[in-house]
């Protein structure tokens, strides 16, 4: 049951250049975001329109990081992506969140 003091839980997906993996994982750990899963990918997009829209290159080897934490910690980390990792610039990465209302197992 969610109380007024409890925080929302969100899942963040982070896609970036593979060479940034260690720096991103260190930053996540420093931000106390510990529940993460790392996967490798290749390229961001296949169509010219989406490539142009997001400024991504097809030939980049990527790292995909999935994290689950509180919305407060994730929002602070998203700000850190802008200031330290320049995610507001083209060809750096994409990060987005999805709220998690409940988890069943």
Regions found by a protein language model. Give the residues of each.
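Positively charged, small/polar-rich N-terminal and surface patches that mediate targeting and assembly
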Residues: 1-105
């Amino acid at each position: 049951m969610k109380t007024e003091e409890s925080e929302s839980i969100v899942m963040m997906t982070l896609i970036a250049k593979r060479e940034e993996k260690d720096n991103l994982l260190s930053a996540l750990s420093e931000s106390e975001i510990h529940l993460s899963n790392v996967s490798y990918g290749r390229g961001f997009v296949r169509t010219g329109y989406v490539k142009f829209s997001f400024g991504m290159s097809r030939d980049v080897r990527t790292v995909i990081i999935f994290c689950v934490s509180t919305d407060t910690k994730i929002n602070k980390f998203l700000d850190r992506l802008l200031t330290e990792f320049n995610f507001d610039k083209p060809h750096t990465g994409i990060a987005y969140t999805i709220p998690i209302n409940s988890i069943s197992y």
